[in-house]
């Protein structure tokens, strides 16, 4: 009798779950990422290895670290990505402001993960630039900017704060995985992930590693000019292709607040309708416009909370409106996320 070409369902599942190890022509070198890993054949340590071509074309099994990441982040209720298509629109500044906004409620615990590997600015803005990473039997301990605000960044690992990080993609991806797998985040109400501009390896890695544990969505940051909106359209397209919900769009630097009289005037003209019109065109929520206040830069330079230092600023009131709009988009009670009694 001719053998059947149909495999048993259980054996098929077993093969998919346990792919065969590729036949190597040389022993695995030191620092090898593993012949079955997602980085096999592409990592920096693979350069010059006789097995590189074999590993690069071999079938890849599921990443064994994904379940560990999911378990590590099981105590995190909400995960939010902060994205911008263009650099210089104030994305990291907005991340720090959003973190302080959430942390104004003492009942909430907030974490910020800085994945802008080559330009880590979050520690400076949150006042923990001089901190270092402490390693214990339970993992890496984040730095605490406040009793309820934790921070993790590559800045804590640099011997000198002005050292440049010159890394290729696989090494960046490895560090992001460590931030998720090895950092003892504990129980958090919100984990904010600050990302670099564009759609690079860092964005793909964060999406891959967090997909199983669940991402609430992404907040887009732009300025009113069309040159910024052009890149935001690409970023929104990236999110839709990657299966990431876009929670809303924030228009930063929408005006200028005079520090003397607090009058607001327009500097960057919304030549094509600005963020509000783009949000309508793309079918996403418009969370609000935040004016440019020089005191925001001052608060970030000193690592202080803008909300505590300048509660009467129009920018402060606008940011609180953005936070409440974001809470609504996430299905949360805005008055619980940012209680009314905390308003100026």
From Swiss-Prot:
Its cofactor is [4Fe-4S] cluster. It comes from the Eukaryota. ATP binds at residues 85-92. GO terms for biological process: iron-sulfur cluster assembly. Residues 19-43 are annotated as: Disordered. Binds 4 [4Fe-4S] clusters per heterotetramer. Contains two stable clusters in the N-termini of NBP35 and two labile, bridging clusters between subunits of the NBP35-CFD1 heterotetramer. InterPro entries: Mrp-like_CS (IPR000808), Mrp/NBP35_ATP-bd (IPR019591), NUBP1/Nbp35 (IPR028601), P-loop_NTPase (IPR027417), YlxH/NBP35 (IPR033756). One of its GO terms (molecular function) is iron-sulfur cluster binding. It is found in: Cytoplasm. GO terms for cellular component: cytosol. [4Fe-4S] cluster 1 binds at residues 32, 46, 49, 55. The keyword Transferase does not apply. Keywords: 4Fe-4S, ATP-binding, Cytoplasm, Iron, Iron-sulfur, Metal-binding, Nucleotide-binding. Pfam families: ParA (PF10609). The keyword Hydrolase does not apply. Heterotetramer of 2 NBP35 and 2 CFD1 chains. Component of the cytosolic iron-sulfur (Fe/S) protein assembly (CIA) machinery. Required for maturation of extramitochondrial Fe-S proteins. The NBP35-CFD1 heterotetramer forms a Fe-S scaffold complex, mediating the de novo assembly of an Fe-S cluster and its transfer to target apoproteins. Belongs to the Mrp/NBP35 ATP-binding proteins family. NUBP1/NBP35 subfamily. This is Cytosolic Fe-S cluster assembly factor nbp35.
């Amino acid at each position: 009798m001719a053998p059947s070409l149909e495999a048993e369902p259980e054996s098929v599942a077993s093969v998919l779950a346990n792919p065969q190890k590729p036949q190597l022509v040389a022993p695995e070198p030191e620092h090898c990422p593993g012949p079955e890993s997602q980085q096999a054949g592409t990592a920096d340590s693979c350069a010059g290895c006789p097995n590189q071509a074999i590993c690069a074309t071999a079938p890849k099994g599921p990443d064994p670290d994904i379940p560990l990441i999911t378990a590590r982040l099981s105590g995190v209720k909400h995960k939010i990505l902060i994205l911008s298509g263009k650099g210089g629109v104030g994305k990291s500044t907005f991340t720090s402001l959003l973190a302080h906004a959430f942390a104004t409620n003492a009942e909430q615990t907030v974490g910020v993960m800085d994945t802008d590997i080559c330009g880590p600015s979050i520690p400076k803005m949150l006042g923990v630039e001089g901190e270092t990473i402490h390693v214990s039997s339970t993992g890496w301990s984040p730095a605490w900017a406040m009793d309820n605000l934790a921070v993790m960044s590559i800045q804590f690992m640099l011997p000198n704060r002005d050292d440049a990080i010159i890394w290729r993609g696989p090494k960046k991806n490895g560090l992001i995985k460590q931030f998720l797998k090895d950092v003892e985040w504990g129980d958090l109400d919100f984990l904010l992930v600050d990302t670099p501009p564009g759609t690079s390896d860092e964005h793909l890695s964060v999406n891959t590693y967090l997909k199983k544990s669940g991402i609430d969505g992404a907040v887009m940051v732009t300025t009113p000019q069309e040159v910024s909106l052009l890149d935001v359209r690409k970023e929104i397209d990236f999110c839709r292709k990657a299966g990431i919900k876009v929670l809303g769009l924030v228009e930063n630097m929408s005006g200028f607040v005079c520090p003397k009289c607090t009058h607001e005037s327009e500097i960057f003209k919304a030549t094509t309708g600005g963020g509000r019109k783009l949000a309508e065109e793309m079918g996403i929520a418009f969370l609000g416009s935040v004016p440019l206040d020089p005191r925001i830069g001052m608060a970030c330079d000193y690592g202080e909370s803008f909300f505590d230092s300048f509660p009467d600023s129009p920018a402060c009131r606008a940011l609180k409106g953005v936070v409440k709009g974001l809470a609504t988009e996430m299905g949360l009670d805005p008055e619980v996320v940012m209680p009314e009694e905390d308003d100026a």
